């Protein structure tokens, strides 16, 4: 079908097709183009979902293998986490902080671990995961001291545990 189609009005999804050879316009309405496009979109959506599922399964497999082999530990590293909680005595001035306490950090970990982007460098996992939540989780403080609420955070994994901090 030619890309030069005529629409009856701005919001109409029906297309008026015409014969390119004779130039005579036919008043034939067709929803074929719209239906074909919808099918294409569905196929693309299915492919994207499969990619995401494969990525999440791969992330979970990497994390599970790392836990089993002792590379990372499923326990909150409280001393590091307190540096990123403004209400705690261990908070370091100028660091990004999450809203809530250690329980909040554990809840974020349980909800989002394995669902973000594992950070790799030259094919090796750096024991970091980049996550985007649907809700605000804390405040990111940049190098100039400007504070911005954010729904993004990092999980840093290690042999002695994990900790979480907001990112931009």
Show where each model-derived region lies.
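Activation/maturation switch segments at domain boundaries
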Residues: 1-69, 139-168
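Functional cores of ribonucleases/endoribonucleases
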Residues: 1, 60-168
């Amino acid at each position: 079908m030619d890309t030069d189609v005529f629409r009856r009005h701005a919001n109409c999804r029906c297309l008026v097709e015409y014969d390119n050879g004779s130039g005579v316009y036919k008043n034939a309405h067709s929803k074929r183009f719209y239906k074909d496009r919808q099918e294409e979109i569905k196929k693309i959506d299915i492919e994207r979902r499969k990619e995401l599922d494969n990525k999440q399964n791969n992330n979970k497999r990497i994390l599970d293998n790392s836990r089993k082999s002792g590379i990372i530990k499923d326990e909150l590293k409280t001393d590091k986490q307190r540096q990123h909680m403004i209400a705690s005595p261990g908070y370091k001035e100028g660091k990004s902080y999450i809203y809530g306490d250690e329980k909040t950090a554990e809840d974020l970990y349980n909800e989002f671990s394995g669902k973000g982007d594992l950070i790799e460098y030259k094919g090796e996992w750096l024991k970091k995961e980049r996550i985007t939540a649907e809700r605000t989780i804390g405040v990111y403080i940049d190098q100039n001291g400007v504070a911005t609420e954010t729904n993004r955070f990092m999980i840093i994994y290690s042999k002695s545990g994990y900790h979480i901090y907001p990112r931009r």
